[in-house]
């Protein structure tokens, strides 16, 4: 089974993917027949260009031409069949590529990325898909908190990137919401916690995903407020 977790940068894809894996481990066990039950991969690894090249070409990572979508679909289909793949690895800290890695699928593969539902070929690789659509201001806070802590950016640089990427988000990322089986929406609550709303559009059992969304809500911490002009 292949589960796709899709959304903009900073929308909570990594947190939700980890929560889904944790729910699977809690409900059905973490391992079976000597191997991990869940394999998780980041589809940012399929960027076509490193950070410096994207800057030279004036492309954002959200643009389809900036990603190896055909190879992504090929590898997802192979993992769905139970076959191993040798995939690229993108290093977010340095904005470069690390050596390729060998991936053997578990019973369940969780693939998270920006454009996982962009093409029909990609969509056909998934058994269940989730789109993360948090409140825009919350997403900005999450992205600033992550990118300043883990990727070496200043808050001002993150805000500039968000502004620059907004058109590509609206053009390429947001429309994928229509193809998702489950849409998860977080928003700030007056008491400082987060509210959670879901839109389920499938008859499949999605109880693990919904439990994971609640688990992720409990783990999420709102970052400090950001300027309105960053929106």
What role is predicted for each listed range?
Residues 2-4:
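Short hydrophobic/aromatic beta-strand immediately N-terminal to the Walker A/P-loop
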Residues 9:
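The conserved Walker
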Residues 13:
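Conserved lysine of the Walker
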Residues 16:
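Hydrophobic positions on the alpha1 helix immediately C-terminal to the Walker A/P-loop
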Residues 21-39:
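Post-Walker A helix-loop "phosphate-sensing" segment adjacent to the P-loop in P-loop NTPases
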Residues 39-42, 48-94, 108:
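Conserved nucleotide-sensing/catalytic segment adjacent to the nucleotide-binding pocket
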Residues 98-151:
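ATP-dependent NMP and nucleoside kinases share a basic, alpha-helical "lid"
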Residues 167-231:
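NTP-dependent small-molecule kinase module
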């Amino acid at each position: 089974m292949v589960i796709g977790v899709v959304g903009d940068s900073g929308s909570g894809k990594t947190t939700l993917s980890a929560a889904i894996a944790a729910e699977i481990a809690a409900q059905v066990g973490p391992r079976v027949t000597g191997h991990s039950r869940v394999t998780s991969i980041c589809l940012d690894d399929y960027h076509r260009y490193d950070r410096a090249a994207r800057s030279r070409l004036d492309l954002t990572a959200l643009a389809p031409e900036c990603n190896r979508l055909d190879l992504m679909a090929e590898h997802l289909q192979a993992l769905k069949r139970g076959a191993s793949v040798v995939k690229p690895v993108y290093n977010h800290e340095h904005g470069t590529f690390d050596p390729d890695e060998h991936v053997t699928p578990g019973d369940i593969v969780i693939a998270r990325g920006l454009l996982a539902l962009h093409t029909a070929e990609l969509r056909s690789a998934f058994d269940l898909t989730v789109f993360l659509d948090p409140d825009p201001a919350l997403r900005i806070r999450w992205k600033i908190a992550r990118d300043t802590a883990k990727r070496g950016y200043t808050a001002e640089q993150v805000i500039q990137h968000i502004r620059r990427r907004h058109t590509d988000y609206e053009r390429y990322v947001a429309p994928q919401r229509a193809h998702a089986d489950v849409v998860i929406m977080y928003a700030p609550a007056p008491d400082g916690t987060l509210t959670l709303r879901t839109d389920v559009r499938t008859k499949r059992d999605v109880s693990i995903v919904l439990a994971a969304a609640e688990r992720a809500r409990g783990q999420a911490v709102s970052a400090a407020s950001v300027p309105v002009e960053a929106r």
